[in-house]
Amino acid sequence: MQGKCWFLENKALKPFVCFYGGDQFLYIGDRIVSYFSTNDLYVALRGRIDKDLSLSRKVELYNGECVYLFCEHPAVGIVNTDFKLEIH
């Protein structure tokens, strides 16, 4: 299936891809792609680079949606760096 991801980083041999989705499905463009198991879930990048990126991390958000991170190597952690701390 061809589609566009939410985010693609393609810096010198360290590509990774992020998709939005939910429990057992991903949004690819305007399509919903469901899956049964995350064990064999991967993204095949074809074009300027030819790489298969496996699912490294699935992050569940507070609203029930998920962010899926695909990359070549395991992700140690994901940190939210866009927050504001207000002290009253």
Curated annotation (Swiss-Prot):
Coiled coil: none
Pfam families assigned: Corona_NS3b
CoV 3a-like viroporin CD domain residues: 1-75
InterPro entries, per the entry: a/bCoV_VIROPORIN_3A-like_CD, Coronavirus_Orf3a/b
Family: Belongs to the coronaviruses NS4b protein family.
Listed name of the protein: Non-structural protein 4b
